[in-house]
Amino acid sequence: MKVSNFSSLRELTIAALVISSVTACGGSGSSNTTPEASVTPPTPPVSETPSEPDWQAGVYEPESNFINQCESPRSGIDPFSGNSYPDEAGTAMDEKLWMRSWTNDTYLWYDEVDDNDPANFSIAAYFDQLKTTELTPSGTPKDNFHFSRATEEYNTLTQTGVSSGYGVEWEFVSLTAPRELIVQYTEPNSPAETAGIPRGASLKTIDGVDFVNANTQAEVDVINAGLFPSESGNTTNLTFELVDGSELSVSVTSADIEVSPVQNVTVLETSAGKMGYFQFNTFIRTAQGSLINAFDQFVNDNVTELVIDLRYNGGGLLALASQLSYMVAGPNQTDGAIFETLQFNDKYPTRNPVTGSTISPTPFYSTEIDYNAGLLTNTLLPSLSLTTVYVITTGSTCSASEAVINSLRGVDVEVVQIGTPTCGKPYGFYPTDNCGTTYFTIQFQGVNNKGFGDFADGFIPSSTPNFEFELPGCDVQDDFTKPLGDASEGMLSAAIQYAESGACPVSTASSTSASLISGTQPNTPSDSQASEQANASESLIAIKPPHTQRDELILHNKINEPILRGDN
């Protein structure tokens, strides 16, 4: 895509006011009539209505010409930053031309984006198509990670770990009849946990509607409203079939749910030694304290083996991924080594286009981070100094989770993969707000200490790994019949057996390289997959789960935030 500059003329049209003097004539035929004084009405204030900027194919003005020029500008104080909103009156075209110039400047594959006339799209639809349409070697879309979200909602979720709902994380097996929705896990102290909804429960009815087979729009509307409440205080009646075949009926009321990123921290006794285990669901700021507490426990208990359960972890903050990797590998293996180096598009071989700083590798962060200030502290993190680690993965294991796997392999820590292929996202972005919407567009690719970062089709467990994207390990499906953290749960049990014997369970020992060839990945349906299911048959009506987009958008992405060394 050829880039050049042009000047877009912006004119404000101000209507001229014509002031007329009005003269009144008096008396009949008097020659001494005196004209009345002329009256000049006050000039009304000029209303400066922004005019539409112009689009010219292949020509890109600097994004600074359009940023914060908003069709519906915010006013007042941003509660998260304490600063005034920067918005000014603008137009929808201003917003679209900003994202167009921003994409052309920072998008990793900017030269693969079609330059379509923004006038033909809404603001949201225009952003949706500002991405490559190329495919990976397996035939899947090259860019599956292109999203936007209301800035207030994004800040609420990432900075507070709070979202509205029942506290259930779902496995979407089928969105159209016959539907299947299974409970992955529930958040601690949530309405769902309080109601006793267990892992593996399959939803059967919602507010009296047959969830599995209902196929009228009215019924599906009831399902969507009950299953995905838009606010707290909504009460819904749910019926489940449990793994033992029994039925559970509960009444739950939606509430603000605090996400607990680290769960089920435990130490297991195995013949290979003491094995630490924890379920890690998302790399958000509030996870730092819980991770430190978990590793303090492992260090105190003299753990020699570690299983990190990343099966539902779509990613998040790179800095936190670096900290976790350090806590696994310890100082001797990471001192002076690179956690990850970011590579931007070919316009910026040495400079970060977002921060303006010279590109420098991200180290393995060995201290706590003040995430509010973006500063490293002097408080050293606990570490296990392991040479082998076991990771549990599925197609929902993505981005920053994959960065942990890749970075540890970069310093020769053996990563044994138990589960199914990861999602394949060596890419990331800087969330960028404009006019109340935060945009996520791929801006960089990460490579490890050895320069490897080509796993666009995911990391794949294999009994006979031959390629860089294949890891030693076992192909094991998610086991919903047992609680997470239970030593008999299928994936954790396979990790224990591998640690004890160096071999996979007999029934799961085959390689999953076929997944790469077919392009299949077991995963929670994305919005595009949901759309495909919805369009599969005109006679089938699909539910539309809004929080799958939330998960992909916020929790399932590699997010880079600058971290500086503090003075303390």
Each language-model region and where it sits:
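A general structural signal for short secondary-structure junctions and capping/turn motifs
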Residues: 4, 157-160, 228-230, 268-269, ...
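Hydrophobic helical h-region of N-terminal Sec-dependent signal peptides
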Residues: 13-19
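Alpha-helical structural motif
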Residues: 14, 95, 487-491
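C-terminal motif of bacterial Sec signal peptides marking the signal peptidase cleavage site
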Residues: 20-24
